Amino acid sequence: MATKIKLQRLGKMREPHYRIVVADARTKRDGRVIESIGQYHPKSDPSIIKVDAERVGHWLSVGAQPTEPVLAILKVTGDWQKFKNLPAPPPMKVAEPKADKREIFQAAARAAAGAEDRPATTPKKAKKSGSAEEAEAAPATDAPAAGQ
């Protein structure tokens, strides 16, 4: 039986996730698999690649052929070079750890507590009640009587 190491597509439209699987060469892309040996998430930055190196080595040693996309993934992880006794690839880009939500909340709470002590940056405008009333009253008293 000819076996291939290929990608099985999962996920939503325009948000693919793949499983790296070993399957018979004649099966469909998402058909029955013999074994799942890894995962690939291309949309995250950097792409997430998880491969069981021991199982990949086993399947390559018994003659399983990787497809072109899987071969590229195995070259990035270094499993292909290990199988072919080639020099190792450069290290992969590692994602930065995400900040803890609790720490973010506490920092925002401390900043808000400090903001309450200060006055507002734009104070309210004072009403000009005296000058507005004088402007309205002046034309009424200065106007001569219409009958004179």
From Swiss-Prot:
A single MF term (Gene Ontology): structural constituent of ribosome
Pfam families (alphabetical): Ribosomal_S16
GO biological process: translation
InterPro entries reported in the protein's UniProt record: Ribosomal_bS16, Ribosomal_bS16_dom_sf
SUPFAM superfamilies according to UniProt: Ribosomal protein S16 (SSF54565)
Residue ranges, compositional bias (Low complexity): 137-148
Organism domain of life: Bacteria
Segments of this protein annotated with the region Disordered: 106-148
Keyword annotations: Ribonucleoprotein, Ribosomal protein
Cellular component, GO annotation: cytoplasm; small ribosomal subunit
Ribonucleoprotein found in the keyword field: yes
HAMAP family reported in the protein's UniProt record: Ribosomal_bS16
Family: Belongs to the bacterial ribosomal protein bS16 family.
NCBIfam families according to UniProt: PRK14520.1, S16
Name this protein carries in UniProt: Small ribosomal subunit protein bS16
